[in-house]
Amino acid sequence: MNKKAMAAAVSMILAGGAHAAQQERPNVIVIIADDMGYSDISPFGGEIPTPNLQAMAEQGMRMSQYYTSPMSAPARSMLLTGNSNQQAGMGGMWWYDSTIGKEGYELRLTDRVTTMAERFKDAGYNTLMAGKWHLGFVPGATPKDRGFNHAFAFMGGGTSHFNDAIPLGTVEAFHTYYTRDGERVSLPDDFYSSEAYARQMNSWIKATPKEQPVFAWLAFTAPHDPLQAPDEWIKRFKGQYEQGYAEVYRQRIARLKALGIIHDDTPLPHLELDKEWEALTPEQQKYTAKVMQVYAAMIANMDAQIGTLMETLKQTGRDKNTLLVFLTDNGANPAQGFYYESTPEFWKQFDNSYDNVGRKGSFVSYGPHWANVSNAPYANYHKTTSAQGGINTDFMISGPGITRHGKIDASTMAVYDVAPTLYEFAGIDPNKSLAKKPVLPMIGVSLSAISPAKYRSRRAELRG
């Protein structure tokens, strides 16, 4: 499809949405997966069963050329604002000597930008947030400060998925805590991240008056490491990955070709692995397969929680007038424990024995081999890199006005285009002044405005 045809097709996507917004304001729900690879879920060629996301894909459409940042916080800042991550204050992930005190690297959302939550709240929406925030914890940068009426937020970048809430490492400890509506909270004994986030979101949606539209931000921390899932979910994938990473990768490539996401004549990339699967000992193979088993369980469980959200929308009569967006913040993460700059003493607290992998008290990451599988068809490029495997991730949209059901569109879309697109669907003026002082205009454009004449180029910094 040439660029002119792409632009025409994408304009058709929004034609119904703009009309619907004039009649009845749609609910808008943004669902985010954390560190998930391009081909992990079934709509993008994955073997992990994700029936609810598959249903969303069949009732809506997929964008195969959606681009984001190679790192979490910068991506989330662009998604929530429609601005660049530097404009939003998230120019990088950490404080470096060269960026301390520099505008654009405050590492928190600044007042130079307006968030979707602020604009939807101004339009009368009940604005709800559950899950990972990672956009600042100081006054003026928290979810409550940035437009959410209610927020159950994990404030940091990553943590245990159970109630022990152990940080990713010593470097993450300062913002490893949860808040509900701005107040720190402890976690119940039965806490598991994906289930808790969805449960809270469902409760708030059910409590919202039927006549009031909802803007919801459901930001899962799955499948970010540490890889952990409830036992019953891990058991579902027993033995599935004992064939090894190279074979699973080849199978994903075949399904990507069958879907038309990559061409039939695309050569299979060479996986530059430290050890081929066959070179591993039987014990190493068994352990490695178990780690991927846990990763798959996390994604399947996340999909089930999305299913509870869809059921809530039906129960509350919102399912026919809700725009659903699903996306991933960045590509799969190849890193292992050392990445989080923790001391040997930190790692002594974990039991990573085979039987305990994936349970509370363990901390495992799946490393570069399985990350290559997750990022198929992109070999050896991943989170932290500004190559395809780090920045070309999943995007799906369904709901009123989305008429190309089941289609996979190859139009180019960027993370900062999401906010203006959703504003157009909801009939919200993105230029209305909400702040006491002027804010920067968005750099993103609505999907309906993308055309060859409006070609834009932006480059991400490494780890930003």
Curated annotation (Swiss-Prot):
<feature type="modified residue" description="3-oxoalanine (Ser)">
    <location>
        <position position="72"/>
    </location>
</feature>
<comment type="function">
    <text>Plays an important role in the mineralization of sulfates.</text>
</comment>
<keyword id="KW-0732">Signal</keyword>
<dbReference type="InterPro" id="IPR024607">
    <property type="entry name" value="Sulfatase_CS"/>
</dbReference>
<feature type="active site" description="Nucleophile">
    <location>
        <position position="72"/>
    </location>
</feature>
<feature type="binding site">
    <location>
        <position position="34"/>
    </location>
    <ligand>
        <name>Ca(2+)</name>
    </ligand>
</feature>
<feature type="binding site">
    <location>
        <position position="35"/>
    </location>
    <ligand>
        <name>Ca(2+)</name>
    </ligand>
</feature>
<dbReference type="InterPro" id="IPR000917">
    <property type="entry name" value="Sulfatase_N"/>
</dbReference>
<dbReference type="GO" id="GO:0004065">
    <property type="term" value="F:arylsulfatase activity"/>
</dbReference>
<dbReference type="InterPro" id="IPR050738">
    <property type="entry name" value="Sulfatase"/>
</dbReference>
<dbReference type="GO" id="GO:0046872">
    <property type="term" value="F:metal ion binding"/>
</dbReference>
<keyword id="KW-0378">Hydrolase</keyword>
<feature type="binding site">
    <location>
        <position position="329"/>
    </location>
    <ligand>
        <name>Ca(2+)</name>
    </ligand>
</feature>
<keyword id="KW-0106">Calcium</keyword>
<feature type="signal peptide">
    <location>
        <begin position="1"/>
        <end position="20"/>
    </location>
</feature>
<comment type="similarity">
    <text>Belongs to the sulfatase family.</text>
</comment>
<keyword id="KW-0574">Periplasm</keyword>
<feature type="binding site" description="via 3-oxoalanine">
    <location>
        <position position="72"/>
    </location>
    <ligand>
        <name>Ca(2+)</name>
    </ligand>
</feature>
<dbReference type="GO" id="GO:0042597">
    <property type="term" value="C:periplasmic space"/>
</dbReference>
<feature type="active site">
    <location>
        <position position="134"/>
    </location>
</feature>
<protein>
    <recommendedName>
        <fullName>Arylsulfatase</fullName>
        <ecNumber>3.1.6.1</ecNumber>
    </recommendedName>
</protein>
<feature type="binding site">
    <location>
        <position position="330"/>
    </location>
    <ligand>
        <name>Ca(2+)</name>
    </ligand>
</feature>
<dbReference type="InterPro" id="IPR017850">
    <property type="entry name" value="Alkaline_phosphatase_core_sf"/>
</dbReference>
<keyword id="KW-0479">Metal-binding</keyword>
<dbReference type="Pfam" id="PF00884">
    <property type="entry name" value="Sulfatase"/>
</dbReference>
